Regions:
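A preference for well-ordered globular domain cores
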Residues: 1-117
Length: 117
């Protein structure tokens, strides 16, 4: 889990709100893809529920990642951006695919769209 990603999650908290991050640590001492974020440490989900994709906390993580990806390409939608109409449309399509990511059935197996080149 990179620092920017963790920052996006933490920035979504209200002041004074508690949170915990659960997950396995890999050989590089980094969290794996199955990190569970919860704002209420007492509501730790069971591992079976996590593996079944029934973790609303995981959707918080996905939305945080999506927010970061959308913010990183906000510039492509500015009126005076030096992009062709075709490129701007490609970016609009990419951004819509990001917005639609919550339609995926499993928050642990997200297929992220590839940004335009």
């Amino acid at each position: 889990m990179d620092i920017k990603f963790l920052g996006n999650i933490i920035s979504s908290l209200s002041p004074g709100q508690d949170f915990c991050i659960y997950g396995e640590v890999n050989d590089e001492n980094d969290y794996n893809q199955n990190v569970v974020f919860t704002q209420d440490p007492s509501s730790k989900p069971t591992w079976a529920a996590v593996q079944a994709g029934q973790s609303p906390e995981q959707w918080v993580i996905v939305r945080g990642q999506r927010k970061g990806r959308l913010e990183s390409c906000d510039w492509t939608q500015l009126e005076d951006v030096p992009l062709t109409a075709e490129k701007k449309t490609e970016w609009q399509t990419y951004r819509q695919a990001l917005r639609d990511i919550t339609n995926e059935p499993d928050p642990f197996n997200i297929t992220w769209p590839t940004p335009p080149a």
